[in-house]
Design a protein with these regions (language model features):
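Short S/T/G/P-rich N-terminal loop/turn motif that feeds into the first structured element of a domain
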Residues: 1-58, 63-75, 98
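C-terminal structural segments of small proteins and small subunits
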Residues: 67-95
């Protein structure tokens, strides 16, 4: 397989909501940061299991221009400052592909 080194990168978020109010605060602050780094939320909502078991009930897929940009977003001080709110809002995991 010949992979394009300039391909888009995707962050896949899986989570279970702990606190809907905290989730709303987190989303209102995280979404502009995603856009600031050229990211786009492609899908958000409950998972529909096609095969296997799902440990998490909700998901989100975010596209970034490339892997370096996705990692820069996640490690940005402005995003890292939101982790306390995020962790109160969700039991989650983030994965990167691309």
């Amino acid at each position: 397989m010949d992979l394009d080194t300039n391909m888009s990168a995707y962050i896949v978020v899986e989570g279970v909501v702990r606190d809907k109010e905290a989730l709303a605060r987190y989303g209102s602050q995280a979404t502009p940061l995603i856009k600031q780094f050229g990211g786009e939320i492609l899908a958000f909502g409950p998972w529909e299991v096609i095969y296997g078991e799902a440990a998490y009930h909700n998901g989100m897929i975010i596209r970034f221009p490339d892997k370096d940009t996705a990692l820069a977003w996640y490690s940005a001080p402005a995003y890292q400052a939101l982790l306390e709110i995020r962790n109160a809002a969700l039991d989650c995991r983030f994965r990167l592909v691309g």
